[in-house]
C-alpha cells in the first residue's frame, strides 16, 4: 500500500526507519469511524508485563524489517524510542532490546522533568550529551554498557525570548497551523491562568527540546543549535504536528550551513 511504499522510499534514500511504540493504543476502540481511548493506563511501556513488552518489540521489528527488506534486503532495525519518552525503568525493557537486536535508544531528554496525570519522568539530573553508553539505567552513563543512548537534547529560553516567541506565534498563525489532524496527549496537569502567570514571572529560563513541532522560530532554533557545544544535536519532529514554519526552519538551518545526518552516518563517524 501507499504507507509501505513511503517507508520503502525512505530507506532507499538512505534514511532509517526504527521502532517507536505507544502502547496505550492497545486499549483503543473504534466508534462512529473515530478512535476512542478507553484509558491511558498503558501509556508507559512499563505498565505491561515483560512478556508483553517482548511480544510488542518482536511484532514491531519483524513488521518494519519485512517492509524495509523489500527495498533493501539486508535492512535491520537497530534503534528504539519510547512513546512519551518513558523508557525507565529500563530493566524491564532490556530483554526485549537484546532479543530484537536493538542497540540504540533515543528516549532520553536531558533536563526534562514531567509530572503528569498520565505519566511522569525525570531526566533533570542529566547533562546534555550527544551520545553515551549505558547498562541498566538510561540515566547513568557506563562506558562499558552495551546500549547506546542518543538523547534528544534541549536548550533554555530566557523570559524575553519566551515573550518574543509567543508574540511571533501570534503574528504568524498561518505558519503555525499543523498539516495533519492528529493531536498529542497532554502530559501537563491543567493549572489556572493565574498560576501560569505567576510561574512565568518567577522563572528565569524555560526548557525546550530541539524539535520541529508546531510553530518554530527559525532564527531562535538556529541560534540555539549554533550555541550548542555538542558535536551534533538530535532534533525531534512528529509528522502530525508539522507546520509551514517547521519546513522553513529546516531550510533556514541548511542555508546557515548546518548538515543533517542519518543515524548510520552518526554511528559510523563517531565509531559508536
Where in the sequence are the language-model features?
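Metal-dependent polysaccharide deacetylase catalytic core of the NodB/CE4 family, i.e.
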Residues: 1-86, 145-149, 154-161, 232
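Flexible loop/turn segments at secondary-structure boundaries
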Residues: 1, 26-27, 89, 113-114, ...
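Structured helix-beta-strand junction loops
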Residues: 12-14, 100, 229, 256
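Generic structural signal for well-ordered alpha-helices
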Residues: 3-8, 57-65, 94, 219-223, ...
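A generic structural motif
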Residues: 106-113, 259-272
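Active-site-adjacent pocket scaffolds in enzyme catalytic domains
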Residues: 79-226
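Residue-level detector of anion-binding/catalytic polar loops
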Residues: 16, 103, 259
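Substrate-binding cleft of secreted/luminal carbohydrate-active enzymes
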Residues: 225-246, 263
Amino acid at each position: 500500500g501507499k504507507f509501505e511504499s513511503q517507508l520503502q522510499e525512505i530507506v532507499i534514500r538512505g534514511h532509517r526507519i526504527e521502532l517507536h511504540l505507544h502502547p496505550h493504543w492497545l486499549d483503543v476502540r473504534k466508534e462512529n469511524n473515530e478512535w476512542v481511548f478507553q484509558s491511558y493506563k498503558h501509556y508507559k511501556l512499563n505498565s505491561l508485563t515483560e512478556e508483553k513488552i517482548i511480544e510488542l518489540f518482536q511484532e514491531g521489528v519483524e513488521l518494519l524489517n519485512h517492509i524495509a527488506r523489500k527495498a533493501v534486503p539486508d535492512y535491520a532495525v537497530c534503534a528504539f524510542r519510547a512513546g512519551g519518552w518513558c523508557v525507565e525503568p529500563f530493566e524491564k525493557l532490556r530483554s526485549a532490546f537484546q532479543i530484537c537486536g536493538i542497540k540504540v535508544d533515543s528516549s532520553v531528554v536531558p533536563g526534562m522533568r514531567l509530572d503528569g496525570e498520565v505519566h511522569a519522568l525525570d531526566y533533570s539530573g542529566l547533562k546534555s550529551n550527544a551520545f553515551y553508553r549505558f547498562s541498566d539505567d538510561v540515566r547513568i552513563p557506563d562506558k562499558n554498557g552495551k546500549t547506546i543512548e542518543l538523547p534528544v537534547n534541549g536548550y533554555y529560553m530566557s523570559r524575553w525570548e519566551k515573550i518574543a516567541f509567543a508574540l511571533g506565534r501570534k503574528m504568524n498563525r498561518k505558519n503555525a497551523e499543523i498539516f495533519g489532524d492528529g493531536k498529542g496527549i497532554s502530559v501537563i496537569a491543567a493549572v489556572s491562568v493565574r498560576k501560569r502567570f505567576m510561574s512565568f514571572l518567577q522563572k528565569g529560563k524555560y526548557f525546550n527540546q530541539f524539535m520541529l513541532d508546531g510553530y518554530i522560530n527559525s532564527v531562535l532554533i538556529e541560534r540555539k543549535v549554533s550555541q550548542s557545544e555538542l558535536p551534533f544535536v538530535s532534533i525531534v519532529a512528529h509528522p502530525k504536528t508539522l507546520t509551514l514554519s517547521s519546513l522553513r526552519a529546516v531550510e533556514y538551518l541548511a542555508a546557515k550551513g548546518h548538515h543533517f545526518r542519518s543515524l548510520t552516518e552518526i554511528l559510523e563517524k563517531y565509531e559508536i
